[in-house]
Amino acid sequence: MEQYNEKIGTRKDLVSYRIETAKSDLKSAKILLNAGEYKGANNRAYYAIFHAINAVHALDGRAFKRHKDAIANFNKDYVKTEIFPREVGRKIGEAEEIRHASDYDDFYIASKEETERQIAVAGEFIELSLIHISEPTRPRLI
């Protein structure tokens, strides 16, 4: 029987909330792209990926406070074991680097093409996460 937490509901509720947050971030990234705000769009595309990663972790009852821990554990537990395609790990790392440059590098110039690519990666990752979450026979970590 699934546990219920007064603040967040069930684990399934938390997973759904995080996926919806990822989808909202992706929608925001697209709006920012269309407005020519490429740095902001890169930020939202990264966070779409990050929230989807956290949804996958929540599915197995896991949570991490720091971004690098969430990503490192995702790569260790889901990418290296080929639950998710190996190329996903590289794309997550690239999205993190671009987000970091977009947020903190004063001289970084984000291009429309690069931003479109990051948004596409975020969309693909959300779709992969949804497939994983909905698989009744998916591998369990716990």
Report residues per predicted region.
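Positively charged, low-complexity/disordered segments
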Residues: 135-138, 142
